[in-house]
């Protein structure tokens, strides 16, 4: 005959919380049933039984509720198992003394202290969660601001170069006006992005459509002509005439190509060469490769250069590149569902590769873009 009294418990926790060390230890201990009680454990997820939160006035999870023997007690916080272990001997003692006709209740001081501990732990947990949410939001907004600020450099540089070219007689005034007008339109779009940084996810600022990457790369090469001609750098392109269109944001793709080609020029030796290749890799992807014959990137740096605020190795001109550009490229490519990587050897040069989805009749309503 089993004389053990029932210890009825309810564990309220989300699925991901069940794998934490504290909760796993608690469940393992309860399953071993190595105590003076017959343990009955019910595990409930708050999304499936939200009424439990209101019924037991829970302000934070995970939480362990002792239903019986009375009185009801609630344990919450990050150390539920240790709290349970501290109280279990007391419940056992209470059961024994009741069998002997002795009424042994926790002291009023103990009860007040325990209640205050629970309240403080609940408040701390809520504050930690709020702090984590705010920190992530601030980091996201800072990242967006850095990216948009970096994008502003492109139209400003292009406008400056156009003014210089007009002064040298390389373009006429009507061509200059056309360039300035186009760049001001780009700056206006970027200004709108800045205004939406606090209220909009970066992914929502993308406008995917059917675009021709070959034409965009030709425009970028022409825009950077002054830089590569000045250093006698040769740019060779291998873009098939039947290359399919891609489904992407035209302005963002132009930014990726501009960043990567500009970096290739910066890191190339004078009289060097750069090759731009585009191939229809599979039915779903176009792969773009931009290779230079510069100093190369150390293996230890090849993954880090795509992170925020990472400086690139020194260029051939003795200046160091800043990693915001490559970080922006990574996020743009990833938002389109593609990937970006580098293959590089010291003294041999670097090849940057990235993939973009092929246009297959998609429209803006279709969720082809993913979070970066």
From Swiss-Prot:
It catalyses: ATP + protein L-histidine = ADP + protein N-phospho-L-histidine. It is an enzyme of class 2 (transferase). Homooligomerizes. Interacts with KaiC. Participates in the KaiBC complex, whose core is composed of a KaiC homohexamer and 6 KaiB. This is Adaptive-response sensory kinase SasA. Its EC number is 2.7.13.3. InterPro entries: HATPase_C_sf (IPR036890), His_kinase_dom (IPR005467), HisK_dim/P_dom (IPR003661), HisK_dim/P_sf (IPR036097), KaiB_domain (IPR011649), Kinase_SasA (IPR023527), Light-responsive_reg (IPR052545), Sig_transdc_His_kin-like_C (IPR004358). Member of the two-component regulatory system SasA/RpaA involved in genome-wide circadian gene expression. One of several clock output pathways. Participates in the Kai clock protein complex, the main circadian regulator in cyanobacteria, via its interaction with KaiC. KaiC enhances the autophosphorylation activity of SasA, which then transfers its phosphate group to RpaA to activate it. In addition to its output function, recruits fold-shifted KaiB (KaiB(fs)) to KaiC to cooperatively form the KaiB(6):KaiC(6) complex (independent of SasA kinase activity). The keyword ATP-binding applies. Gene3D superfamilies: 1.10.287.130, Glutaredoxin, Histidine kinase-like ATPase, C-terminal domain. One of its GO terms (biological process) is circadian rhythm. The modification Phosphohistidine is found at residue 150. Residues 147-360 form the Histidine kinase domain. Keywords: ATP-binding, Biological rhythms, Kinase, Nucleotide-binding, Phosphoprotein, Transferase, Two-component regulatory system. Transmembrane segments: none annotated. GO terms for molecular function: ATP binding; phosphorelay response regulator activity; phosphorelay sensor kinase activity; protein kinase activator activity. The N-terminus interacts with KaiC, while the C-terminal histidine kinase domain autophosphorylates and is probably responsible for self-oligomerization. The N-terminal domain stimulates the C-terminus to autophosphorylate. The keyword Phosphoprotein applies. SUPFAM superfamilies: ATPase domain of HSP90 chaperone/DNA topoisomerase II/histidine kinase, Homodimeric domain of signal transducing histidine kinase, Thioredoxin-like.
